[in-house]
């Protein structure tokens, strides 16, 4: 009997540690020291907000007009200007399916539980407004692409029907003219540099490095802010970002990441 209890305790301990072990495979906490682009020029340090629930039964809705309207909606205060700190919390407003009454004795999911895609596919679903508190995490990715799905499943067990907000600050040694932001994302996304809308990546897409590039940008000496929003319904979520020069050559030096 004692042996069984010890075995059960060990199993519970192993199961509890699995999410942390999985997280450590993909990310490490950012340090106070400035980071640099990796050997291929990818920016790996990002401050990421825990995923906001955004119910979509399919990614086919990710056309330009839908994305602009969705990303323009204010989910939290100072959405387009905030420079979040690690661990900072924000109050988020979002929509979720309104819980349906169930027959007495029939188990059901509580309000705010993960999206039921079968229910969504049956037709229009009545939505309700809800609020929750989410937290920012400053992380260094261990891969060139930041695996948002792994981040989401570890932090709040939310992986589908989501919007991720990401921010990073790069510090340029000198003015950098005629550079482009080069991005890959799964699925659709929108990107801003120093508050300017520079790139919209629409449609249901897979993450491919350098999938889209912005117009030519002039980065000033000192701090420059890169902000992104990535949306997905069903499926994996990740992204990668680097800078290229006017000839498409990857920029691997000349700036650090705060």
How should each PLM-predicted stretch be described?
Residues 1-8:
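Bacterial N-terminal signal peptides that target proteins for export
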Residues 18-22:
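Sec/Tat signal peptide C-region and signal peptidase I cleavage site
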Residues 177-192, 226:
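Aromatic-lined ligand-binding clefts that engage carbohydrates, nucleic acids, or primary amines
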Residues 193-241:
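Beta-strand-rich ligand-recognition modules
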């Amino acid at each position: 009997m004692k042996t069984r209890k010890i075995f059960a305790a060990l199993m519970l301990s192993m199961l509890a540690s699995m999410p942390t072990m999985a997280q450590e495979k993909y990310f490490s906490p950012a340090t106070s020291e400035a980071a640099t682009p990796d050997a291929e020029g990818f920016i790996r340090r990002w401050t990421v907000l825990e995923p906001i629930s955004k119910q979509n039964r399919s990614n086919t809705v990710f056309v330009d007009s839908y994305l602009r309207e969705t990303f323009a909606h204010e989910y939290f205060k100072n959405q387009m200007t905030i420079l979040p700190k690690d661990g900072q919390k924000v109050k988020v407003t979002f929509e979720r399916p309104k819980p349906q009454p169930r027959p007495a004795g029939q188990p059901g999911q509580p309000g705010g539980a993960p999206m039921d895609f079968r229910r969504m596919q049956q037709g229009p679903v009545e939505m309700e407004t809800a609020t929750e508190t989410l937290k920012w995490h400053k992380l260094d990715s261990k891969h060139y692409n930041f695996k948002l799905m792994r981040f989401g499943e570890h932090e709040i067990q939310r992986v589908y029907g989501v919007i991720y907000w990401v921010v990073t600050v790069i510090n340029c040694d000198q003015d950098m003219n005629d550079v482009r932001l080069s991005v890959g994302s799964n699925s659709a996304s929108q990107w801003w540099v120093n508050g300017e809308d520079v790139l919209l990546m629409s449609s249901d897409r897979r993450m491919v490095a350098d999938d889209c590039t912005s117009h030519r940008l002039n980065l000033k000496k000192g701090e420059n802010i890169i902000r992104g929003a990535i949306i997905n319904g069903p499926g994996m979520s990740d992204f990668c970002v680097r800078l290229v020069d006017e000839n498409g050559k990857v920029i691997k030096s000349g700036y650090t990441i705060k």
